Amino acid sequence: MKYVAAYLMTVLGGNEAPTAADVSRVLEPVGAEVNPEVLKTLIDAMQGKAAHEVISAGLEKLQKVPCGGGAAAAAPAAAAAAGGGDSSSAAKETKKEEPEEEEEDGDMGLSLFD
């Protein structure tokens, strides 16, 4: 994230196509460690792209990511409320539910550089 922030600071400073050296000059005075491989990956990925276009593309991708969960949590509560007066059976019923399998941590289709 520090590389992206330094890259964007360089762009805001008027350099539309910062190099690795430009970004390093932003990071080094504040004592940030610079990993040349990570920095090269960022510079290569941003090659030929305008920062504002990459940000816009990222926002569009974020809008497509499901982040709900409210409907799934509300369903058992609504069922318990509709069930009537026996709240202990509703509590037992929710305990019997199997835990959801964890999804793999991936980019969730959010790669900005595709």
UniProtKB/Swiss-Prot annotation:
Instruction: Fill in the PTM field for this protein.
Output: Phosphorylated.
Q: Does the keyword Heme apply?
A: no
Q: Which GO terms describe its cellular component?
A: cytosolic large ribosomal subunit
Instruction: Mark out the compositionally biased spans (Low complexity).
Output: 76-91
Q: Where is this region: Disordered?
A: 76-114
- Keyword list, A-Z: Phosphoprotein, Ribonucleoprotein, Ribosomal protein
One BP annotation, GO: cytoplasmic translational elongation
Name the source's superkingdom: Eukaryota
Q: State whether keyword Ribonucleoprotein applies.
A: yes
Q: Which Pfam families match?
A: Ribosomal_60s
Give the molecular function GO annotations. structural constituent of ribosome
What is the recorded function of this protein according to its Swiss-Prot or TrEMBL entry? Plays an important role in the elongation step of protein synthesis.
What PANTHER family does the database record attribute to this sequence?
A: 60S ACIDIC RIBOSOMAL PROTEIN FAMILY MEMBER, LARGE RIBOSOMAL SUBUNIT PROTEIN P2
Q: Which family does it belong to?
A: Belongs to the eukaryotic ribosomal protein P1/P2 family.
Q: Tell me the subunit arrangement.
A: P1 and P2 exist as dimers at the large ribosomal subunit.
Alphabetical list of HAMAP family matching this protein: Ribosomal_L12_arch
Q: What is this protein called?
A: Large ribosomal subunit protein P2
Organism in which the protein naturally occurs: Eimeria tenella (Coccidian parasite)
